[in-house]
């Protein structure tokens, strides 16, 4: 009718919010990759074991051998590493479920605030586990001549290589946790901006 009279058409937009909030697929996909990285770091280190027979002495012409086993349980830093990465994996899996199912149960943005706080705590925990394990890995690879600690990676190469793979996977997970943490805090700040 307005076009027949020569008047301009006016379009009105509804200020009613969308009843279904959009899922943030970037954060969700980063969480999935972080879950796989921390879970693989946990499993690789948890099953990291190498047994090797070594000659320690020779009596006459008979060698005296011993069997040594390198396991992650022998080092408290590696035990902490496995526990921390398992916690980070479980947390990421839990938050993936909350991100998929949780928006319908959100109460005044409490879910996003709680996730942001727990993201920071999980990232800090993962960083401490990675730092402790990296220190012990460096000590195992190079030793410490001042403290007279011998290196072991020349004797247990496969053990050290698998430990290195676990560390790399864990650091990838840590970097992804850092990115997810920054994104979740930014998302929280955008929602609270008036």
Curated annotation (Swiss-Prot):
Keyword vocabulary terms for this entry: Cell membrane, Membrane, Transmembrane, Transmembrane helix
Ranges in the topological domain labelled Extracellular: 46-77, 133-164
Q: Where in the cell?
A: Cell membrane
**So which stretches are on the Cytoplasmic side?**
1-24, 99-111, 186-194
Residue ranges spanning the membrane: these are 25-45, 78-98, 112-132, 165-185
The record's annotation in NCBIfam families points to: A_tha_TIGR01569 (TIGR01569)
Q: How does it assemble?
A: Homodimer and heterodimers.
The entry sums up its family as follows: Belongs to the Casparian strip membrane proteins (CASP) family.
**Protein known as:** CASP-like protein 1B1
Species of provenance: Glycine max
């Amino acid at each position: 009718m307005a076009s027949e009279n020569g008047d301009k058409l006016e379009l009105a937009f509804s200020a009613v919010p969308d009843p279904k909030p959009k899922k943030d697929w970037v954060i969700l996909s980063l969480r999935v990759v972080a879950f796989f990285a921390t879970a693989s770091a946990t499993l690789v280190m948890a099953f990291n074991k190498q047994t090797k027979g070594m000659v320690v002495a020779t009596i006459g012409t008979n060698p005296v051998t011993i069997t040594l086993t390198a396991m992650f349980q022998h080092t408290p830093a590696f035990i902490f590493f496995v526990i921390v990465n398992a916690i980070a994996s479980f947390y990421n899996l839990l938050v993936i479920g909350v991100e998929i199912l949780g928006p319908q149960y959100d109460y005044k943005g409490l879910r996003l605030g709680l996730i942001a706080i727990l993201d920071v705590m999980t990232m800090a925990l993962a960083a401490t586990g990675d730092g402790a394990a990296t220190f012990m890995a460096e000590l195992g690879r190079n030793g410490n001549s001042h403290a007279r600690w011998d290196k072991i990676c020349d004797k247990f190469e496969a053990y050290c290589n698998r430990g290195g793979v676990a560390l790399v996977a864990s650091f990838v997970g840590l970097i992804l946790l850092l990115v997810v943490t920054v994104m979740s805090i930014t998302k929280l700040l955008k929602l609270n901006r008036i």
